[in-house]
Amino acid sequence: MLHIRKTLTTTLAILLLFPLLFLPLSATATAASADKAASKANAKIIYLTFDDGPTAHTGKLLDILDQYKVKATFFMLGPHMEQYQQATKRIVKEGHGLGLHGVTHVPGKFYKSAYSGLKEMQQANESLNKVAGVKTSLIRTPYGSKPYLKPAYRNVLLGQGGFHLWDWNVDSLDWKYKKDHQKVYNNVMQQVHNVKKQGTTPVVLMHDQEATLKVLPQVLKALKAEGYQFEILTKNVQPVNFWNDKR
């Protein structure tokens, strides 16, 4: 009888203590989850984008990005994707963001009508699919969407076409200052700081060209030193464009 009482007492004690064994684990998991969420909310996110590629210089550009463990988003031209197929495939394989930049890059042709731009983006998407087996809904129109992309044009591209329009809020002007790398660097850093002060996430415009390769390492090193995390654009990221069109 005494043995039975001792057994019951021991069993009862174990049952009472059993839930307590999980409290520290649960509390730790909750705290870790909260810390992770807070860290993400406070993260300094930046989006680096490249227009006009792929080109003969894309391989070196990708090497630099890989060296600094950075992902970017490429807004590519249809004919260039077909001409530089290995570069296109590598962009996809290495997990960079994918965007379309049309076919002609000629304002008089792309913006000729409300449907000419849509046709170019659809054609560019077919080129991407043909070369790399994927498609994208992200677009950046030639020379930016303002003032060319009138409301009716946007409704066709974003409404009927189902595309998401991206411009930028940090212009490196690397196409203009091809030999003045310090100017390009200063443009990026000053504008990034200004945009961040406004509480906005920086979207940096650069170009897939030889001159950009000279300044890119300096830019990446500086931004990483300031704690920026480079992420890619996706359909789930709210678009930044000159019309404030969130479609």
Model-derived features with residue positions:
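Bacterial N-terminal signal peptides that target proteins for export
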Residues: 1-15
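Hydrophobic alpha-helical transmembrane segments of integral membrane proteins
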Residues: 16, 20-21, 213
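Hydrophobic pocket-lining residues within nucleotide cofactor-binding pockets
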Residues: 16, 81, 170
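Sec-dependent signal peptide cleavage junction
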Residues: 20-40
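Active-site beta->alpha N-cap acidic-glycine motif
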Residues: 33-131, 135, 222
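C-terminal domain-boundary segment and adjacent tail
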Residues: 36, 40, 68-72, 80-82, ...
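Hydrophobic beta-strand scaffold residues
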Residues: 72, 98, 164-165, 230
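Catalytic domains of cell-wall/extracellular-matrix polysaccharide-remodeling enzymes
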Residues: 105-224, 228, 236, 243
